[in-house]
Structures are given as structure tokens and as C-alpha cells.
Amino acid sequence: MPPRIPNAPSSLLLQSSACSGSSSRCTASRLPTWASSCSSSSPQSSQPTTHQQQCSSFSTTAPAHVQSVRRQKMFSWLDKKGSAYKEHTRQGPNLLGGQGKDGLAVPFPNNPYFKSQPVLSEGSREIIYQDVMEKGLPIKAVSAKYNVDVRRVAAVIRLKEIEKRWIKEYKPLARPYARAVMKMLPQTVLGGPDQKPHESINDVHVHSYTTQQLFVPVSESREFTREDAAKAFGDHILPVDKKLRVPELIEFQKDLLKEVPLQEANRKFLNATAASEAKIAEREAKRRQAVEDAITRVKTDRFEFRFQEFNAENVGHDGRDRNAVGWRYGVPFPDRKRSQIKIPTKVE
């Protein structure tokens, strides 16, 4: 059963008057705001009547705006200490966590292990573009000069080419948005006297085969090198010297240890990086030419038909080789078929 509404006290009763016709109106009395009395516009309606009606105990007043202690502390912090983070008024990050011991910004104070990595400034990207495109320096040499990863240097050059092409085509650029974002991020400025390394450029990828422990018998008279260690883990494992993004730096450091003059070591390093990039460019050009030669083009008035020869037997050991015929259009995988092994059968 629903709860019964208790009777209201006598001091909160509504006085009803004999309202006749359309001349009656309802006016507020001196009772509380949620209690009102109905009185007639005639002078006789001001007399109290013997009929009294009990009012409901439900209140129609607005609830009091009572804040919890945590909410009060939150607004107090926003008005005092938090006001410094409301608007960005300086160059560089303005984060709540401040900076860590290594000088990197910490966005989240409760997670000091998450660091905000710096980005290349607009001037730094222009310097990289000029060194590669105007001065003709090899990409690996620019990467070693400014301690910027080779892939990042290549990305900067491509984006700069697009930007300059858009400027020539009079396309609008989001300059205000870029300035607002760059103003809030830590930046690396290249070319200055106190230039700092932007990132590590010789991080080596750890292959899963090299994480296991091996016991290899080696004679005392034999010199066990990094190439021998890589061959012990597998014939397809490359040594560390060949895994680096800029392996020419190893020979450069060896020349410095041999007390070769710095200018001579720099000249040899530039020649080695230029020869390496020329070899990569030649190999890529041959690959593209081979792909182009394998395609027969037949042009019509409306379309261009491209024919390429395929061997239907080259489908791989499971019939799903990525270079096989029809791989692009796909074959349904047997994942939902019965008697199919869906769990790994070996550990790699």
C-alpha cells in the first residue's frame, strides 16, 4: 500500500472563501510560500469561513543549494590554484604535473611514468628541409647531425613538400590552429648552441628469437663476435651492426678511435651515407620498373585495361599466399568450421 500523507498542522491550513462567479481570484496570504488562500474580490470574502481544507504536506519550494565538501573543495581549488591552468598564457606546456627528473613534462600528476615527448618546432622542420632539398645532404647524415630518426626526417620532407605545394596553389592552411597547438607542446629547437638530442636514432628492435637463453660452446682461442651471436639464435637473425638505422655511424666512431682527423671522418661518413642511399634508390627504381614491365596496358576511349600474368600454382603452403590469384578478393577463413585447430601449435 502507498504511504499515507499525515495531516498538516492547523497553522498551515488553507482558508477557503465563498467565491462566486468569475469575480473570484486567488491571492497569497501571510502563510508560508507554499500555502495560499483563496479570497473573493468582494469585501464580504475577507470574512473567515467555518469550512477549512487541509493542505498537502508536500513542499513546492526550490531545494536548498547545498554542496558537498568535495564539491566545495573543487570550486575552491579552481578559484585559487586552478586559475593558472584555465587559460594558456605562456610558451610551452602548462601542465598540472609539472616536469619530471629528466626534464620532460608530466601531464598527469598521478602517473609520473607518462611523459610528454617534445616535437620539432616549425623552424627545426624548415632547417631539415633545407639541408636535404637545398644543400643536398643525405637523409642519414641529417639524422645523425640533429639526432632525429630517419623516418621522421623523411616524414618532415614529405609534409614540407605538400605545404609548399599548397602555398603555390593558394590553398588555405590551418596556421592559427597549428600555432595554438604548438604553443602548448614542448618543442625541440635545432641549430642552436645548446641543442639537445631530439630522440634516440639507434634503437635496436629485439627479435623474439633473441629473448631465449642459449648455451653455445666456444673455444678460448676463438673471438666470439656479434655476428656469431646472431647466427647462434638463427640464420635469419641480423647482427646489431646491420640493424641500426644509420650503421655508418659505427665506422665513423671507429675512425675517431683511430685518431683520424674529424674533417676526414666526416667526409668518409657523408660519402658512405650518400652511397648507401643511392643503392637504396637504385634498388627501389628496379623494383618499380619490374612491376611496370609485368603489366600490359591496353587503352581504349574510356578505360585502361591492365593485364598481369600469374601462376595459379603459387598459392603458398596453405593456399592463401598474399601474392596468389584472388587473394585480394579473399577466401572465407575456416575459423567456424569443425575440426579446425584454432590455438597456437608452437611458441615463437
UniProtKB/Swiss-Prot annotation:
GO terms for biological process: mitochondrial translation. It is found in: Mitochondrion. GO terms for cellular component: mitochondrial small ribosomal subunit. The keyword Mitochondrion applies. The keyword ATP-binding does not apply. One of its GO terms (molecular function) is structural constituent of ribosome. It comes from the Eukaryota. InterPro entries: Ribosomal_mS45. Residues 37-57 have a biased composition (Low complexity). Keywords: Mitochondrion. Residues 37-63 are annotated as: Disordered. Belongs to the mitochondrion-specific ribosomal protein mS45 family. Component of the mitochondrial ribosome (mitoribosome), a dedicated translation machinery responsible for the synthesis of mitochondrial genome-encoded proteins, including at least some of the essential transmembrane subunits of the mitochondrial respiratory chain. The mitoribosomes are attached to the mitochondrial inner membrane and translation products are cotranslationally integrated into the membrane. Component of the mitochondrial small ribosomal subunit (mt-SSU). Mature N.crassa 74S mitochondrial ribosomes consist of a small (37S) and a large (54S) subunit. The 37S small subunit contains a 16S ribosomal RNA (16S mt-rRNA) and 32 different proteins. The 54S large subunit contains a 23S rRNA (23S mt-rRNA) and 42 different proteins. PANTHER family: 37S RIBOSOMAL PROTEIN S35, MITOCHONDRIAL, SMALL RIBOSOMAL SUBUNIT PROTEIN MS45. This is Small ribosomal subunit protein mS45. It comes from Neurospora crassa (strain ATCC 24698 / 74-OR23-1A / CBS 708.71 / DSM 1257 / FGSC 987).
